[in-house]
Design a protein with these regions (language model features):
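Active-site-adjacent structural elements that line small-molecule/cofactor binding pockets in enzymes
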Residues: 1-331
């Protein structure tokens, strides 16, 4: 390919099912993030937690990604995904989200192909440009103002490399001559594109299998689904992306007061901002309270929820997430 823009997403992502529009929508899938530091507690503890998650009927385990966030903390998302994949034989892993513009696309394609060999069909690759910490971007040698353009170029390169075909690229950011990654994954890796802006939603329409939202209303979510579909049609994709998702911090406990007491300090510590800045987008209370908050998003087209549950203990977080899934299936 002469430039990343030459890659057609229709050629590198699964074709939509023409009969899907005639079926009732499936209940939303529900995944969760593990407690912070789980992998550092050793394989026995981490493996037991993943077995508990899978046994509760939760659909996937999630992992984030940061290089040097706010005060310098981070944990590489694809290293986490690899470790998690080795600790359970079947549980899917959802990266939510990997900061793709901070990396070289050929190296990322190699990592993805290797994970596909170790855990076939189990990775959902959520990507984003990063928004909360511009300093994290700049210390990686990337101009924060170029993140969107770099994402477009990276996605086009990664998608084509994962098909096992050579890539020649004379782009704005990358020069490649017959780059090749083998063996290619036996099945396409779903790529879900995160971000709050219209630009991110359009990117999902052009290059993604779905959009991953955060901090938005059900009305905004429905508008995003429509905008992604319009963008997909504009670039000639055979159908709209449909793997739309929401990332949701939530508090799960026996009462609203107890749930908020878990959620608020956790979010303030992570983002270094007052909880009130996020509160209207973050449900807390019992599983019924959280499911009631999420149901309008499912009605707006959300197929997956990635919960970041905060509870008095990990067992209650798992049980609460599983209960939310069951309640949404009945909604």
């Amino acid at each position: 390919m002469s430039s990343p823009a030459a890659t057609s997403p229709a050629a590198t992502s699964p074709a939509p099912d023409p009969a899907a529009g005639n079926r009732a929508p499936a209940p939303p899938r529900v995944g969760m993030f593990p407690p912070i530091g789980l992998l550092e507690r050793g394989p026995e503890t981490a493996g037991a937690f993943l077995a508990q998650v899978a046994g509760a009927g939760i659909d996937h385990i999630c992992c984030g990604d940061h290089v040097s966030f706010l005060v310098g903390v981070g944990f590489d998302g694809l290293i986490q995904a690899t470790a998690l994949s080795m600790l359970h034989p079947a549980l899917p892993i959802y990266s939510g989200v990997y900061l793709l513009p901070l990396r070289h696309p050929v190296l990322v394609a190699r990592q993805l192909a290797d994970i596909a060999r170790l855990a076939p069909g189990r990775l959902i690759f959520g990507v984003g440009v990063g928004g909360e910490d511009r300093h994290e971007v700049s210390v990686c040698g990337v101009d924060p103002a170029t993140r969107g353009l770099r994402m477009d170029e990276c996605l086009a390169i990664v998608r084509q490399l994962l098909t096992g075909t050579p890539v020649t690229c004379h782009g704005t950011f990358f020069e490649l001559d017959e780059a090749l990654i083998l063996p290619a994954p036996a099945a396409p890796i779903p790529i879900v594109i995160g971000g709050r802006s219209d630009a991110a939603i359009r990117r999902a329409g052009r290059l993604g299998d779905g959009w991953l939202g955060v901090w938005n209303s059900p009305r905004r979510f429905a508008a995003a689904v429509e905008l992604a579909a319009q963008e997909a049609a504009a670039v000639g994709r055979p159908g709209p992306p449909s793997r739309h998702a929401m990332q949701v911090w939530c508090g799960l406990a026996d009462s609203k007061e107890a749930a908020r007491a878990c959620l608020a300090p956790a979010m303030q510590a992570y983002y270094q901002l007052p909880f009130e800045r996020f509160e209207r987008y973050c449900p807390y209370g019992t599983a019924d309270d959280v499911a009631e908050f999420l149901a309008p998003y499912a009605n707006a087209g959300c197929a997956e929820f990635n919960l970041i549950p905060q509870s008095p203990d990990p067992d209650q977080a798992v049980a609460g997430a599983a209960a939310v899934k069951k309640l949404l299936a009945r909604a």
